[in-house]
């Protein structure tokens, strides 16, 4: 019995001295393992006289239970200490400010489209849309574009078949709107268009806004006045604007519109003209009664000029360093 008390005392001392679960398990093995001191005591019961075995066995079991209890208590204490240390290491200071959600921003091309829509909306122009996959009638024929015009070739246009293509301009929306409604009409048609070209100033997909006004007694002076006011509003300065004679199949007369930059050079910004009588006839409108003007502008072109961007491709490369400048 005195020997068992010594084992219990040694075991208890070793258990209390264990500073980790690994060290505690080593103590368990030392006293309760297959070759542990208390296990050896149980195995030696067979050597005792029968009349002593029962009492000795009870004493050994009491000692074993005492060691097991001490092990369990120490294990609980070590696990609690380990958990507290882990929680302390992961403590969050709830008084610290939270992480701010990063604010998004409109793409510069979207900003430009909205700015254009806002200006013309104040003049009573509606916003119309149409399919990006267009047929040859709405993309070419109804716009007075000849069968041998270069725009009808694979070099310029993405064809699905001879009669179906990705639209090369939003002028098809103008034709569809004229088919569905009768004058007086004033509307703009913003959207994506596609052409087979890719370099510093061209991409296969880009955005256009085309506008049209059809009514009685519409003249070129009205067109000039609206576009002059639009450009001064868009660039937020009193610009010098000039109209140069040009040619488009769907307008007559036609003009290119330039603005004078700060360096004194003229910069082309859009095209315009009076709607060609053949275009009106193609949609059943009498050109003797009604006249109209049309204009078209490249959104990326205007955006580049407004924000001083030199490479058109930057708008489509999704570089956050570039896009964050426009928040």
UniProtKB/Swiss-Prot annotation:
The answer to whether keyword Metal-binding applies is: yes
EC number in record: 6.1.1.20
One Gene Ontology term of the biological-process aspect is: phenylalanyl-tRNA aminoacylation
What GO terms are given for molecular function?
A: ATP binding; magnesium ion binding; phenylalanine-tRNA ligase activity; tRNA binding
* Record's cofactor remark: Binds 2 magnesium ions per tetramer.
Residue positions annotated to bind Mg(2+) are 252
Subunit organization: Tetramer of two alpha and two beta subunits.
Q: What keywords sit in the KW lines?
A: Aminoacyl-tRNA synthetase, ATP-binding, Cytoplasm, Ligase, Magnesium, Metal-binding, Nucleotide-binding, Protein biosynthesis
Q: Which cofactor does it need?
A: Mg(2+)
- What is this protein's record name? Phenylalanine--tRNA ligase alpha subunit
Kindly state which reaction or reactions the protein catalyses: tRNA(Phe) + L-phenylalanine + ATP = L-phenylalanyl-tRNA(Phe) + AMP + diphosphate + H(+)
Alphabetized PROSITE patterns for the sequence: AA_TRNA_LIGASE_II
Statement: the UniProt record of this protein carries the keyword ATP-binding: yes
Regarding protein family, the annotation reads:
Belongs to the class-II aminoacyl-tRNA synthetase family. Phe-tRNA synthetase alpha subunit type 1 subfamily.
A cellular component term from Gene Ontology for this protein is: cytoplasm
Subcellular location as annotated: Cytoplasm
